[in-house]
């Protein structure tokens, strides 16, 4: 990682003191934080003074290690204290953590936190959301060139304004409508357009418990036509059907094509989105499941219609996987790499322009949609982060597949030739979207790789993206993303299945399988390095770094025999091995041989690589220098570290309150990491809260840091979204995002304003002294 003297990450403003405590009974919600706890371990945790809250430094190689309890008072009760850890992400453990745990200073209390807080006085004020009658567009040119390798467009424009255009809007209203009226708002935008009789706007409605108007029914699906005079009900009862089912979409497309034949067709998918793995849609009437890409593909195939463009007014759908599906049926594709603000697309202007000239070229249509969307979202709130891109699918079909195949194959060769770190470094630096869905900007990833094959892919992709707009300081969002596993493998099975169904290039499937498998092996072998908890105190018993040991460990684990015991923490009873994979989201399936994607040959072939690219726990020693504790590593050892973050737990006398993860840390003038903790943490309006870093986008001197605070807003589970920028370094609350839990994996479009009179309760996770998650509390 890059180091420089001084603080890293977010700026602090110390503005007061606060307390940390639990109240009431446990909520039974499951973890509201990252779910990792502070891991577990064997071995001594070192001495703690009689108060149970004294200073000591702890270190663990994996988040899956449990901390020891340390000392306790004579009556067995522990007083409050603070446990902090600095998390170092390792190249070799690309899917896990290097955890440095340290306690600095005395944060004593009897169930409360009496130290000072990094108190961000963030006011949660309602934000006005005006809608422009005519969004102001930017004078930025779109790319109108077309590669000679592009296939012929399926839609042929007649020209001269003679084309008839049918626009199909598949509007699954869900809670976006029932709670916030967002679908009604967009229909009103359509109604404000000056429409031509050559433009047919046909809308299927459904999926919402309630519609915020007096026209649309929530009991059944309906079909409407948007006209200058208002909306005309075409089908009062189109059945009570899940809008996430293929047959529902197929029937709608066929209805539109049959009843409103046209020269040009467009399909707009309106709802939540969840990216390549989750796909489109959350239907409140039929809440189980979404429309995954293989289902979307079946719906389009069965419908038998070809489109001028397919667009997603939904989050996270500008992926190569989605584009590959859409390419079979459409010439252009419009979607967002990132989550969309609640305002979504602004419909008035581009529909008016299209009505004035129904032969308007599709690049110009897409540019207007993107410019208006960007302007309208910024007018709603300057903190809205937006991405929207227009992709020429005919060009993608002719230029990308060969380049993509060569890129994937060459990446597998790097992984197989012990150059895994090249791929891991490129992946760790790639722009990532949303949180925990393993979706990254493909062009940025290829640029980071820097191989000839990667450069060729980047060039081909840039040629296909005819227009792309992103908000300020949202760096490295180039218009198309892809699934690439990193810290969470629980979605690998479903993603590989989807790849099989949609015809993803086998070379890329092999690529992510190889990468994930080597990373899984790195996680496993790291558990064998002896207990690193005592390394800060110079009490290591064996380095655990031999290739023979790694080979024996891998063989035992993959065979399920559990025979390795030479100073490692693996055994047939398997608490450490089992805990490791439990903590490593979704990885228990490896042990149970249910991970169909796992390439065991890749894991065992990487034994030498594991041995030669591991940070020896015995080197992780807290050194006292100038009155502070620091971590001294060589430049080569720091090269194995990908990122740094701070994790803090409060000892309330009965267990640990988890305050979350922040990207605040500091290096001294010698570029040694300072381990001392200054007893400060984020607070909202004076109340210390659990905070989780989500993203850190840096572009030169500009940056945008986004984090979340779990809470209950009027009794509903939400995450408050906090945004820190170079212009507003002390942060603001952008709004609240609903957490759906098991109902759907799609991501809510937009944020909820927090209004005066709302009831807000902050949440935190609570752990035993053995590192076991107990419950979540207010």
Tell where the protein language model's regions lie, with residue ranges:
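Conserved structured core elements
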Residues: 1-35, 56, 181-184, 247-250, ...
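N-terminal extension/subdomain marker
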Residues: 2-3, 20, 82-89, 100-261
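Catalytic-core segments of thiol-dependent peptidases
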Residues: 206-305, 314-315, 320, 337-338
